[in-house]
Amino acid sequence: MSCQQSQQQCQPPPKCTPKCTPKCPAPKCPPKCPPVSSCCSVSSGGCCGSSSGGGCGSNSGGCCSSGGGGCCLSHHRRHRSHRRRPQSSDCCSQPSGGSSCCGGGSSQHSGGCC
C-alpha cells in the first residue's frame, strides 16, 4: 500500500447535512364553540338545546335535564352549600317546548324558557 492510498483512507468523511429540517409543532386549534341553540347562558336565561342533554345542576350554573332540553338558570348563582338541593326546583316542569320557566319553579317567569 502506498502512502497516498493510506492518506485517502484516513481522511474524515464529509459532513452530512440533515435531510429533514426540524418541523415546528403544529399550532393547537382553540376548541370550537357549540352551536348557540345548545348553549346555556346563565346571565341571559337562554335555553338548552336537545342536543346538549342538560344534566347540570344549579351549583355549576348549567342546564337542567328536563326532557332532554331543559332550561338554564337566569338568576345569580347561589352560595355553595354542603347540602344539595334537588334539581327539580331549578328545572322546568315541562320538557323543552313547554311554557313553564326556570327560576325556582314553574310559576315564576323571571327565568329562562323551555
Swiss-Prot record:
Residues 1-21, 75-114 are annotated as: Disordered. Induction: By UVB. GO terms for cellular component: cornified envelope; cytoplasm; perinuclear region of cytoplasm. InterPro entries: LCE (IPR028205). It comes from the Eukaryota. It holds the Pfam family LCE. The keyword Secreted does not apply. Interacts with CYSRT1. Belongs to the LCE cluster present on 1q21. Belongs to the LCE family. This is Late cornified envelope protein 1D. It comes from Homo sapiens (Human).
